[in-house]
Amino acid sequence: MVTLKPTKRDFIFDRFFEKKNNYEYFYYEEDPTVENDIELFGYSKFTCDASYEDGEVQWNYIIKDHRILGITAVKNDGDNLKIKFLEINSKLRGRGFGAETIEYFKALKDNKKYKAILLYPKDEEVAEHFYKPLGFKENGGELIY
């Protein structure tokens, strides 16, 4: 099962978005046993800043067996848990780590008694092939579980 380790948004931005090509590998500094194995493609600092102006967002590393698999950002929005960002290392996709992360959030929803998990997928293909098979339903422009 994956776990989440909180981190600071600025640390992620410094590591990913300020690099010229965004191909930087690094280790989880608070736990030196975590390997250098995460990368993030296709996002600019501007895009992420614009996406998260609506309040406090908790950034987390997605970790399994001391390996950073990806990053996620979530927001406690009263009765709902909003997944603002979920990205698995492109070299590790298709192995179920994203689905494990969603299962983690489903368990969190049940334990915290959130009414729903909300998210806004990058595109319709991601919604159809990833989130909907995991139980998410369309609700206007968002997906809800």
Question: Which residues are covered by each model-predicted region?
Answer:
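Acyl-donor-binding surface of acyltransferase catalytic domains
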Residues: 1-12, 137, 142-145
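Acetyl-CoA-dependent GNAT
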Residues: 7-84, 89
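Conserved acetyl-CoA-binding loop-helix of GNAT-fold acetyltransferases
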Residues: 88, 94-107, 133
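A general structural motif
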Residues: 112-116
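Conserved beta-strand-loop-alpha-helix junction that forms the acyl-donor binding cleft
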Residues: 118-132, 137, 144-145
